[in-house]
Amino acid sequence: NTTGAYLPQKPYKLKLSKKADLIGFDADFKSKDWALLSICTGNQVMKNQECNLLTLGGFTVCRALGFPWTPRTEFVNVVLNGQYRGLYYLAETVEQAEKRIDVGADGFLIENDAYWWKEGEQYFKTEHLPYMMGYTFKYPDPDVLTEDTKNAIHEYMNSVESAIFSHSGANRYIDYESFAKWLLAHDILGSDDVAGSNMFLYKESLGN
């Protein structure tokens, strides 16, 4: 993440040439996309700046609350170009996959993204979204995203916002239990990044 880039221990995003199960579950968990999350943290909630217990605690809290999916992790020692870089969390990343976030062929996965403005990024904005934020597409893949599907997702999110801000019929669009669990997890953890970037929303079928 961007904050982590300024810390002594850098996080890394891994993009493999072919799918692999790096954590060692089974073939169903194979993926090209993985993350190496740093142990150190700049989060002021944590008293010990040497140990990022917030990340590990977050995964534990989400599993305890019964989230449909929480990234699987494993501690790993990282050596890069012959140099030892320290202890990391090897973690699954957020993506459409049967063993991650499975929205099916007709669903979508988007991110409330502070870096929507990056060159080549496909994005859209809604009326009530803060000016510094934009929604970017994670699934369908932006490279194959049709204009019709893009417009349908945009229209759907406008309807979601309208229902929320008019206090009428929001339950037709959002899963209250899922939203409540998400808020509770951030309250328990004292997260200072709630509703910032790295917030993902998904729908399993755009037609329903």
Question: Where are each of the predicted segments found?
Answer:
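A conserved helix-loop-beta module that forms one wall/lid of the active-site cleft
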Residues: 48-81
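Internal "kinase-insert"/substrate-recognition segments embedded within catalytic cores
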Residues: 18-21, 29-43, 67-71, 83-184, ...
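Conserved NTP-binding catalytic cores of kinases and kinase-like/nucleotidyltransferase enzymes
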Residues: 1-53, 57
